[in-house]
Amino acid sequence: MLYGENFTILSKSKNWCKIKLHTDNYVGFIIKKKFAKLFKPTHKVSVLAANIYRKPSSRDKQNKKLTFASKVYAKEKYGSFIKFENQWIRAKDLKPINYKDENIFSKINLFKGKKYKWGGKNFNGIDCSALVQLFFNFNNKFCPRDTKDQLNYFKKKIELQNIMKNDLIFWRGHVAIILSKKKLIHAYGPSKKVLIMNINYAIKKIEKTANLKIISIRRTN
């Protein structure tokens, strides 16, 4: 989950809370101390990883970052910095909470070459379905977390010869984002990173190495 995501606590144990995310109804566990009271976010992180500062000064950088699409409540602004909770972040690393990109995947190259991590959803590692969901979330649109649920959610089926930018190609347990008639991008487990590939090459490679054929291609808009 990301900083600023809202959730409901389902149950508590000594050190853990079982929660359900409001974003996609995903259920999981977090450490009790890892959350704060509900706040209404005013801004969201628009860079891959935004540095956090103790004071509104570039000399007071902490060893912490907020990942892309995290949400904050801006308490005040001082120079080029914005205060959230008791920390500071550069204003240039944020967008207003209602901001939307004209092209939902326009910032996708932020994750190019980044580490593949099953279950990951941030700059330290991300999986294929999170790469899709994250950009819908950033643009204030719903998208399920898992590949099978994304396949069911996006209804409009497309033939390979009719693909367009922002279409999604689905295999069993895997999804890729179409960038153009010839290119796609995906968080690719076997290579352990987010890669741009030729579409035909990717289809053949996945069929050869994983024995998987395309299940469907879906339009997202």
Pin down the residues of each PLM region.
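Boundary regions of SH3-family modules and the immediately adjacent low-complexity/disordered segments
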Residues: Y3-T8, S13-K14, K20-N51, S57-K64, ...
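Catalytic nucleophile-His microenvironment captured as a short glycine-rich beta-strand/loop
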Residues: L168, G173-K181
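Aromatic- and glycine-rich peptidoglycan recognition patches
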Residues: L94-P96, K148, K156-K157, S180-N221
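Catalytic cysteine-centered active-site loop
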Residues: K115-I163
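Conserved "cap/hinge" positions at secondary-structure junctions
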Residues: S11, E76, R172-G173, Y188
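Short, well-ordered loop/turn sites that connect or cap secondary structure elements
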Residues: M1, L66, N162-M164, I169-F170
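Hydrophobic residues embedded in beta-strands of well-ordered beta-sheets
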Residues: C17, F81-I82, A176, L184-I185
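Short alpha-helix capping/helix-loop boundary micro-motifs
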Residues: I52-Q62, L151-L160
